[in-house]
Amino acid sequence: MNLEGLKIKLTAVFEPAPEGGYTCHFEELPEVFSEGESLDEAKANLLDALTQVMDYHREEARKSGVPGAVREELQLAAS
């Protein structure tokens, strides 16, 4: 399978928090959310939250997977 040129885009939404800083989430993945004192910190925290959610779902899928299923890890480059 040729993944060259494949791009997956997610829309990050950063909202000012009443107490200061920002809350943030991905529109396409509402279960991925975070916060930060600055936009840069919020973005870094949101990407960390995405990694944690992906790791969680990967482990859960492996626990309940179908015997004999073929798994292939696909690497997607961020731009």
Task: Identify the meaning behind each predicted range.
Residues 1-10, 40, 44-79:
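Short, charged, surface-exposed hinge/linker loops at domain edges
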Residues 9, 25, 34:
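Conserved beta-strand segments that form the floor/walls of ligand-binding pockets within enzyme
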Residues 14-27:
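Short aromatic-glycine-(Arg/Gly/Cys) micro-motifs in beta-strand/loop hairpins
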Residues 20, 31, 54-55:
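Intrinsically disordered, low-complexity segments enriched in small/polar residues
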Residues 30-39:
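A short, exposed loop/beta-hairpin motif centered on an aromatic-Gly-Thr core
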